């Protein structure tokens, strides 16, 4: 016999009290912690419990009785449906306050180590149109809003280009205007969409993988260059001819595009790292500039998506490193070598290590472009590359700069850092929780001397944090 489904309760007139680490807000009812999206502290709401565990629950606000005094009006028409920019309902001054609190809470509760006063967060000067890269998805299954569903009509146009709906991978929200990237991105996306509608191009079915148009990536840069990459599935010659007609339309309509590229992806997944990139018009790259340095950005290159704030982040890291020109610096998780090349003129030598071979090739090219002679770059898994033998061969670092992925550093990597005993460690993190865990391990030999949070992603809960550690006496 089937188990009887438990009715989940409706809680009335609950006050939202705080913001959680993952961007949802918090309410407490009889010692039960409830996580709620799209509300802010001070809202009084009715909550429909959606999922209940022993110590916490997840809920949806189904009715507002009072709006918080700090609530802001969302500026995006897609707010609440699109999975991005969930903090639009918080004024930016409140967003950075909670991000500062997130850093403090993680370092104190997880790290449990002695800390100096944490510096005020560096907010982003741009809070809209701050990203230099967006990826759009095509789909023949457009997400219908609640209002559209309630109209109970059959929609002729179900193709869409936009963003995936959270927890519904095969559905895409049709985006009319996104506030994350320069408006040229909106104009290109909408023009491609309209051209595809008018000429009956097929959009991919994300379940069956049938259809031509798959993805489009737009990259902008502070130099004014513009890259567009169109990704499609092509199995017949006539499809290729049709696709090139679209590419020519894009080139003619947007002469400001300096790099128009395309990729044929006939696989069942969206990864493009193993696929050939073809140039339809212009160059196969664009450039970013920072303090006179030029960084080559290709279609597959990683580059921090908020260029202006990345510069501020790197300046903090360089300042914390305290370089005099005589130091050997290790840059761990160097990516395309941006930090390594950025600090190179202040160091004797910089050694960068990164898992992705293509990123290391970009790092070498960027060093060559800028005439930098004192960098060495190595590709390989960090825990396999950074060993005592490596240090014995290339020298004991005076300073280590580490910028690991969200998972933080492997225990073996921490152990080798402790063995190397650099005078200073600059730890750049996109996840203060795993950073706090690693700081606790480094506490065996190091003392935290400075902490500087940096907001790279306004209207999201994400926060970067830079920590300076010095070797204890």
Named regions from a protein language model:
Residues 218, 224-233, 294-298:
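Short, aliphatic-rich beta-strand segments
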């Amino acid at each position: 016999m089937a188990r009887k489904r438990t009715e989940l309760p409706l809680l009335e007139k609950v006050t939202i009290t705080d913001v959680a680490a993952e961007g949802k807000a918090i309410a407490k009812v009889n010692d039960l912690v409830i996580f709620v999206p799209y509300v802010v502290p001070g809202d009084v709401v009715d909550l429909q419990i959606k999922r209940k565990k022993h110590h916490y629950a997840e809920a949806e606000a189904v009715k507002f009785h009072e709006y918080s005094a700090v609530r802001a009006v969302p500026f995006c028409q897609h707010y609440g449906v699109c999975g991005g920019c969930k903090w639009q309902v918080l004024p930016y001054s409140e967003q950075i306050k909670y991000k500062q609190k997130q850093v403090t809470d993680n370092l104190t509760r997880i790290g449990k180590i002695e800390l100096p006063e944490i510096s005020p967060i560096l907010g982003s000067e741009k809070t809209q149109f701050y990203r230099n890269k967006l990826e759009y998805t095509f789909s023949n299954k457009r997400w219908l809003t609640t209002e559209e569903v309630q109209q109970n009509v059959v929609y002729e146009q179900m193709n869409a280009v936009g963003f995936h709906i959270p927890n519904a991978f095969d559905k895409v929200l049709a985006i009319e205007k996104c506030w994350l990237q320069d408006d040229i991105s909106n104009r290109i996306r909408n023009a491609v969409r309209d051209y595809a509608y008018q000429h009956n191009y097929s959009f991919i079915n994300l379940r069956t993988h049938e259809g031509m148009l798959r993805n489009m990536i737009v990259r902008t840069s502070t130099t004014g260059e513009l890259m567009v990459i169109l990704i499609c599935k092509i199995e017949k010659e006539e499809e290729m001819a049709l696709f090139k007609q679209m590419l020519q339309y894009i080139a003619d309509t947007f002469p400001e595009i300096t790099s128009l590229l395309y990729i044929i992806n006939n696989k069942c997944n969206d990864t493009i790292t193993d696929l050939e990139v073809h140039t339809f018009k212009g160059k196969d790259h664009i450039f970013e500039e920072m303090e006179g340095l030029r960084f080559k950005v290709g279609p597959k290159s990683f580059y921090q998506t908020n260029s202006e704030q990345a510069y501020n982040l790197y300046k903090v890291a360089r300042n914390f490193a305290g370089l005099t020109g005589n130091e050997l610096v290790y840059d761990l998780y160097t990516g395309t070598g941006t930090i390594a090349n950025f600090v190179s003129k202040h160091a004797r030598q910089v050694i960068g290590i990164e898992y992705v071979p293509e990123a290391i090739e970009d790092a070498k090219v960027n060093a060559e472009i800028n005439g930098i002679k004192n960098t060495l770059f190595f590709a390989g898994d960090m825990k396999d590359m950074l060993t005592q033998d490596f240090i014995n061969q290339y020298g004991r670092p005076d300073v280590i700069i580490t910028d690991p992925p969200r998972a933080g550093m492997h225990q073996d990597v921490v152990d080798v850092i402790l063995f190397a005993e650099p005078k200073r460690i600059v730890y750049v993190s996109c996840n203060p929780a795993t950073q706090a865990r690693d700081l606790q391990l480094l506490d065996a030999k190091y003392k935290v001397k400075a902490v500087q949070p940096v907001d790279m992603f306004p209207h999201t809960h994400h926060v970067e944090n830079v920590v300076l550690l010095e070797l204890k006496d």
